[in-house]
Amino acid sequence: MPALSLRQKLLAPLVFCLLALLALTLFNAYQARSKAYEARQQALRDFVDSADSLIAAIAAEAKAGKLPEEDAKATAIARVGQLRYAGGAGYITSITTDSVVLNNPASPGINGKNMAGFQDAKGSYLYRNIAAVGASAQGNGYLTYWWPRPGAKEPSEKLAYAKRSTSWNWDLIAGDYVDDIQQAFIATIIKSVAALAVLGALLSLIAWMVTRSVLQAIGGEPAVAAAIANRIAAGDLSQTGLEGTSHAPEGSVIAAVQR
């Protein structure tokens, strides 16, 4: 393996440090994205759980004879439909286990319709997937689907939490867009890489200037100066056959010993 030059020896740890910083930046960005996603998941779960608790309380009143069951169901559907999430943008859709929409506050036109054949922008059967989550052993879970943001044409990814409310065997679902998490992640990566590029360029310039100054003072690579010193110590003052000594700048160590 050929010996590294002084410049290479100075730049090698610099490159290593920059790569380590890049790896750390990527790791932190991935961690931040993961935590943001988990926080979004928990918020959706808490929101749907609160609706399920509300339904359970109303169902308990009906079971106690305080309300006729049909009136209790209508009350539960209406009150769940009034719940809001994420500053009013999020809501809960109530669906029967056979994919008939009881109440979708954002799209009341589909209330009462069987949506089993509905597909999202990516071709996924959303309501079938909701029913499958509700019918699972856990009775709840997360799913994703694609839907345009208000006023947008292109679909964006939404994270949803679905849960089967056992009081009247309804499926409840709430969703929130998560493309902002990915956008924030990409923006962080771009900013970090740009900052590291500037830092790397600055440090490389400093390393180059330091190396240039040291090489000018020595008159060449330290290995050449060491070879000259070894020859002098051995009594050889010819200095012939050594590469890198012919252009030693005036005032350098190598130029001085060549006189």
Where are these regions (language model features)?
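N-terminal membrane-insertion alpha helix
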Residues: 18-42, 58-62, 183-187, 191, ...
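Short, hydrophobic beta-strand elements of compact beta-sandwich sensory domains
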Residues: 157-182, 253, 257
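Extreme N-terminal signal-anchor transmembrane helix of membrane signaling/transducer proteins, especially
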Residues: 4-31, 193-203
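Helix-start (N-cap) segments at beta->loop->alpha junctions
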Residues: 148-152, 174-184, 190
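Membrane-proximal, non-catalytic sensory/regulatory domains of signal-transducing membrane proteins
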Residues: 82-93, 117-167
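Extracytoplasmic/periplasmic sensory segments of membrane signal-transduction proteins
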Residues: 61-105, 125-128
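Polar/charged heptad-repeat coiled-coil helices used as signal-transmission/dimerization stalks
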Residues: 4, 34, 38, 49, ...
